[in-house]
């Protein structure tokens, strides 16, 4: 049987090779095949299609052409491109000869490049485009490209195509325990806990077809080609890509289980007997992301291995394995040719009411169609799942004796069309909302007749259309999940309100607020449903008739496990993160001021690299940083504190820019002056000058910056196009834009904050203090004019002072906002309904006499400190140098994106690490341009009084507009600021040099 199967496969391969045709377009046509479009023009094409809604969806594209798939296979070598550009200029790419075992010439394309290939097509029909590529080192994120055909975007899904990387855990050694189970040799700390493994990239040559990055299309993306020469353009979005060749072909479709099983039976396949292969899920061979590594689950004794005391690496997946396209792969051996069953021990207690889906492949291909979308329903406990049909009959898998792989990939499955339809509905609902508020405003008078029906004659038709689409989505959802779920409740609420508004459109004035809430809830429904988490404990590949034992945990066993956990919680100090150093070893104590996720990651990095490299042990404790100063003064503080926020506990809070912790501790002799270390000057070259300003005073440096954030401008591309507005470059442009927005009942979003005031102050040439920081400089003409300008936006232009701008940006009420750049990460995760409709740019600036635009902004961030009570200052300094280094900050950024996704992206102050984070190339360009203008806000004794009084003056002016004068209010407050500065300088016996103007 085995020989016959291998012979059949060999014949198929020879036939496939025989049909292959290496295509070389005639030289005379190659130059003509190039499109001539620049990368910027391609980017504009994507934007125009996306924001105008003109881009065709793949299903519509496929339905509009004859469903014919030619058997021909066309291949173009990577080196045979017809055009290459880099950074918008003609260039020559780098070449790789016989790279990593692949014979021939490969071409390296950068993330800021475009490359074009020409195909000579003889027969019309649909073709699948695939690439043989190698994921060369980059920023450790998925490779992204836009794909164009003959200079056009055939359909929306090709605007962003991802090519994945391959990862593996850095622990590969294993052993067989006393129970005969193969386990990995994880590192352990002194408490017996397994250390979290790291992930390293394991690149290899990959042939990949094109898939929808959002997962709404679950099949391969195809191109319809007519006879003649066609040009395929690959436009870089993120990460470099090494291309060996491109291929146009059509693979044999995957048959259903019964058809495949009949073919196996006809070939003589038989059941194997007596074999059980057990695979611990945490022993994964490869994954698609550094987010996927062994996890520790102590919730139940059902997992293996289990312990109520130690934290053991015993599962994989969970919340980190939820995003479309993520996959995990395992290797296994079977001793005999024949049929096997496959079972999993899994838990899906994350998504209630619907199932999560996986595409299951063996040796790189799905054996039959049912595994292209296999569902795992909700279960609160660990369970045994045998891969079976809908009637519960276990599938049989034919396997040759020897080594195999099994891969499970997140897909949206049967929910994909529903989610896509609801996404379209949300887009329409938001458009309707913007149309209505142009007539009524965001807070309409219920007793006024706005004549909505007359002013918006197309509204009824729009409401009816979106209602029908939403009703269809609800019906399809119920067909999938039945009536035993509440997942449709949000959609039904939205549909019912649409029924009410179709009947009487004037009701918008009464229900506009609830309509907005319901639209937001519908958008959030998308975020919830596209999350597809699943946790695995182990897998079995076993002969039919063999028994696999998965212990069922009863009530008493579960109760005893919880009692043991409770007992150990009184014995083990859970404020200690990971390894607790031995009493007689050299160690420093580290306090961390953020969350447990961060603390666990930091501790694992310390154990993996810092302690082995330096011999310095680190006791890590997770504490509330509000206690740091008191604990230090009481002699109970740490040696080192990292991720220290502002002394009011809110780094980056709305009311504060800068971080005053370092200087406040420094003037009280609570922290070490880092300039005493001989290599301090070399270390601070890692940071921008602006990040250091807030940490020093009178030549001393009391800390190192960890994070640095600053404002950026966010704008809705679709709405600006709709209104005919350009992205504002100056504040004069902003005022013009605000006029247009006001006419359409929209606003410019900018909450009052020190970041906004500092931005205006610095752009106008002002300063907070004189040169030595002993006097306020807010009484200068520049500062007074800046304060006037600051107040005018909230008095003359009536900007909102309270409502959060991020949700109003999402609904379109505020299509242009100024916000901290970290909002980018939140929008990427929480606002899929406006994906592709927004972008970022440097903040508006002030035009100078020479015509240049000053875009200065202030910044804030977290700080690292060495406490003066330490007995190990040199060891502490070694730790800070390690912690703020390029590689460590880069790895920390990757690790934090592992459990939290893009929302966990770290705004590191290390400039090299910042540029290695997985930003799109265009967004990174915008951030780096703004970075050029970032300034630090100096911190001085008594400096907390500056913003407090500026803020008080602001609210006096903006609430008492008839009588309060910006100049007088600010001048009065400057007197109070100077009094506090003088008081603090006297308190700490500081001497002013009397120098002016900084």
Please provide the spans of the model-predicted regions:
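Extracytoplasmic "Venus flytrap"/periplasmic binding protein-like
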Residues: 608-687, 718, 722-726, 815-816, ...
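Extracytoplasmic
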Residues: 34-540
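Glycine-centered hinge/linker elements that transmit conformational signals in sensory
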Residues: 775-802
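Extracytoplasmic/periplasmic substrate-recognition and gating elements
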Residues: 123, 336, 831-904, 932-939, ...
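Extracytoplasmic/periplasmic solute-binding protein
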Residues: 693, 697-706, 711, 732-785, ...
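Hinge/lid segment of periplasmic solute-binding proteins
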Residues: 567-584, 649-712, 735, 837-844, ...
